[in-house]
């Protein structure tokens, strides 16, 4: 087996936090709130929220009158700009929750007037509590795990696995419309597992590894998610018999290690000591998972 020297020192490990929200230029302007409201309102919905969220107001003290938890509140407590149809409900003795009839609009800032005077006798200047919040601007990022052999008895049969992560809740069918895969101009089948409304795992099936190097093209179009972004990614499919490193990642959680992806699967009992090294680092541990070799350092590096 060829010797692989990972040419980076421990200081190379840098934790890169990718915030999908950071891809957007959306900026929320938080409304200044009169500090005197702190005597009556202990918490409220603010900042950036999901489009599936409710809007809550938490009073500092229990409401002094009888509460009906089985029906929406009759009083018109909330006024939204832009308008949000829905109903207000008591959650407990000091928390009111507005439940929208539909999902909120993505990337929208809302201004709210809450009629505090409908719940208690209060001075004129504190009758209406004004605040605001914004919904997450929808976006998505794609992480490809790399090519792997779908049938260990036939290395010609390949698949490409990955995941598409949305910034906010997304409909599964709309997510599936964002990705198409092609090899030599032929569209390939993509299967999906929707972990939740945010993480969507995909597998591109039917890839063929040939005697000569080829490629697979992934085409992304965010139109179905109301995201104005389209792009392509091309992944090399090594020729049959061409054994090499195709991808390398640094994993930080829950345990820190280097994941090296090879063009062919490895034997689980493959001896790797002396074959894979990290400069100036000894006592490495290894584990083999199909095409991947996980390389663990003796100490966690910041």
Regions found by a protein language model. Name each.
Residues 10-21:
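Bacterial N-terminal signal peptides
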Residues 23-302:
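Acidic, low-complexity Ser/Thr/Gly/Pro-rich repeat segments typical of extracellular/periplasmic
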Residues 2-12:
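Bacterial N-terminal signal peptides that target proteins for export
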């Amino acid at each position: 087996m060829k010797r692989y020297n990972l040419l980076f020192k421990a200081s190379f490990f840098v934790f890169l936090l990718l915030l999908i929200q950071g891809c957007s230029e959306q900026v929320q302007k938080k409304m200044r709130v009169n500090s005197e409201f702190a005597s009556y309102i202990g918490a409220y919905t603010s900042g950036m929220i999901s489009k599936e969220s409710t809007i809550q107001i938490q009073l500092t003290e229990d409401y002094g009158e009888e509460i009906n938890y089985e029906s929406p509140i009759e009083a018109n407590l909330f006024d939204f700009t832009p308008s949000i149809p829905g109903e207000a409900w008591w959650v407990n003795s000091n928390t009111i929750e507005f439940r929208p009839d539909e999902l909120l609009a993505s990337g929208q800032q809302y201004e709210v007037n809450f009629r505090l005077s409908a719940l208690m006798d209060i001075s004129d200047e504190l009758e209406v509590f004004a605040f605001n919040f914004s919904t997450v601007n929808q976006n998505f990022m794609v992480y490809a795990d790399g090519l792997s052999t779908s049938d260990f008895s036939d290395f010609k049969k390949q698949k490409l696995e990955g995941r598409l992560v949305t910034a906010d809740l997304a409909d599964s069918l709309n997510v599936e419309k964002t990705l198409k895969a092609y090899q030599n101009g032929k569209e390939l089948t993509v299967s999906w597992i929707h972990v939740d409304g945010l993480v969507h795992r995909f597998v591109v099936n039917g890839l063929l590894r040939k005697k000569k190097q080829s490629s697979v093209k992934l085409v992304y179009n965010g139109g179905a998610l109301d995201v104005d972004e389209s792009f392509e990614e091309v992944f090399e499919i090594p020729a049959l018999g061409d054994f090499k490193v195709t991808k390398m990642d640094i994993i930080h959680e829950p345990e820190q290690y280097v994941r090296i992806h090879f063009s062919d699967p490895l034997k689980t009992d493959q001896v790797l000591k002396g074959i894979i090294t990290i400069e100036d680092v000894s006592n490495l541990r290894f584990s083999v998972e199909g095409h991947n070799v996980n390389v663990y350092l003796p100490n966690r590096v910041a």
